[in-house]
Amino acid sequence: PQQPFPLQPQQSFLWQSQQPFLQQPQQPSPQPQQVVQIISPATPTTIPSAGKPTSAPFPQQQQQHQQLAQQQIPVVQPSILQQLNPCKVFLQQQCSPVAMPQRLARSQMLQQSSCHVMQQQCCQQLPQIPQQSRYQAIRAIIYSIILQEQQQVQGSIQSQQQQPQQLGQCVSQPQQQSQQQLGQQPQQQQLAQGTFLQPHQIAQLEVMTSIALRILPTMCSVNVPLYRTTTSVPFGVGTGVGAY
């Protein structure tokens, strides 16, 4: 009768002691694996998504602006521009309201006799231009006036920037002059091509062209038909349609 009593508590003690050792290492082991799997895929997905959309729209906007600026450039033969040089001088000086505001402030009004001479020369050359090319020719004259004013403004800015450098560095003047000549050549080529018109210059081109189209045909008694253009003008600038 003494043997079965001590065996039962020993077996139950061994069974209870083995259960926690088998259950404890199984529960915490999958938890760190789940944390690593949740954190690791989240980091690469959020970083590239924030950097992609910032760089994409800016080159597209620059290309659209350059395309619209190129569409506003009149294409005329150089011989026609040389032929209408008296008209350019007449419009550029104070004989007409097309003259630039800076030029009006800097100098006085020309004499009526000189304006009359330029008017006669312009009216002699304008009827010789073919009728279909007169509108683009007048537009090209205004365009060349805007570029000439832009070159003068840039030249004055460059001369102001070069004055303090020449006072501080008098030894390397030949090298500076050669570098300045090399740097001015591509700028003049860019202005000649006309691919860097600013929005305010495009609006100025439209306004000055409309004024010139009111002055020259009436002054010279010449018909200048306006042809509807298919290109879109940016920034709300419109072109007139009709005939003088």
Swiss-Prot record:
Keyword Repeat listed: yes
Gene Ontology molecular function terms on file:
nutrient reservoir activity
Similarity remark: Belongs to the gliadin/glutenin family.
Presence of the UniProt keyword Repeat in the record: yes
- InterPro entries in the record: Bifun_inhib/LTP/seed_sf, Bifunc_inhib/LTP/seed_store, Glia_glutenin
Its function, per the record, reads:
Gliadin is the major seed storage protein in wheat.
Kindly give the SMART domains that the UniProt entry links to this protein: AAI
User: What is this protein's name?
Assistant: Gamma-gliadin
Q: To which species is this protein native?
A: Triticum aestivum (Wheat)
One Pfam family name is: Gliadin
Q: Which UniProt keywords apply?
A: Repeat, Seed storage protein, Storage protein
Q: Highest taxon of the source?
A: Eukaryota
Q: Where is this region: Disordered?
A: 18-64
Q: Where is the composition biased (Polar residues)?
A: 35-48
- Further remark, if any? The gamma-gliadins can be divided into 3 homology classes. Sequence divergence between the classes is due to single-base substitutions and to duplications or deletions within or near direct repeats.
